[in-house]
């Protein structure tokens, strides 16, 4: 009853606490206390940023390590560090029948906690070294993560159906790209673009769609040959949002 009374009292105030990890102040609002009371959990001792870092640390897809295959002993690239203690196999090895995952099974011990045993099981069973299908449905795409159905790609994260793409993140169904962040499909021969779709031979453009040979621009639709422009629709040969004609435009960007 006392504990419930404290929780009920705390649900009506805002409290400032010091994060046990980063030592910075953070605030717990009344609505937060109400939620903790409803879920029957204690109030946090870490600030929101540190809690987010702790949750995200579970998943790694941008740091690669050199490892040895647990079955063949061959060198493999892995998202699991050597210090993790996790045995790894190449994607091709993991999908074969040359190893039996059931051999790693153990009986549940009711005298120990679930998470203690689950952690031990995670570190015992081999995992795919990389989250990609290199050697299966992808070719020459070893240095990729969260990746499928590609060819000749290097350091590409969270992507699929690509060809000749390098140093890019979240790209789908495109080809011949470098330094691209978020492509929603059918992009070709672009460099340093963000949030694009169906763009061709564009450089340094953001939030644009269906554009051709546009440079250093933002929020374009169905435009071609635009330089240092924003918010245009269906325009051609523009410089700083002014139509200048083909001849002058080519002179400007020369």
Where are the regions that the model predicts?
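N-terminal amphipathic/basic-hydrophobic helices that include classical n-h-c signal peptides
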Residues: 1-9
């Amino acid at each position: 009853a006392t504990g419930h009374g404290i929780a009920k009292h705390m649900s009506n105030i805002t409290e400032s606490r010091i994060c046990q990890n980063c030592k910075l102040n953070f605030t717990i609002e009344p609505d937060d206390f109400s939620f903790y009371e409803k879920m029957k959990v204690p109030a946090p001792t870490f600030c929101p940023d540190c809690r987010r870092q702790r949750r995200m640390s579970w998943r790694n897809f941008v740091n690669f390590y050199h490892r040895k295959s647990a079955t063949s002993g061959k060198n493999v690239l892995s998202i699991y560090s050597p210090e993790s203690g996790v045995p790894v196999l190449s994607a091709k090895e993991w999908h074969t029948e040359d190893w039996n995952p059931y051999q790693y099974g153990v009986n549940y011990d009711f005298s120990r906690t679930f998470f203690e045993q689950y952690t031990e099981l995670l570190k015992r069973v081999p995992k795919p070294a990389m989250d990609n299908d290199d050697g299966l449905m992808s070719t020459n795409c070893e240095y990729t993560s969260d990746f499928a159905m590609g060819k000749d790609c290097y350091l590409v994260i969270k992507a699929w159906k690509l060809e000749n793409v390098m140093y890019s993140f979240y790209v789908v169904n495109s080809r011949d790209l470098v330094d691209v962040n978020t492509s929603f499909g059918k992009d070709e021969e672009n460099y340093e673009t963000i949030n694009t779709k169906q763009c061709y031979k564009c450089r340094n453009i953001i939030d644009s769609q269906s554009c051709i040979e546009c440079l250093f621009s933002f929020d374009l639709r169905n435009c071609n040959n635009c330089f240092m422009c924003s918010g245009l629709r269906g325009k051609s040969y523009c410089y700083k949002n002014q139509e200048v004609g083909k001849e002058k435009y080519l002179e400007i960007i020369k």
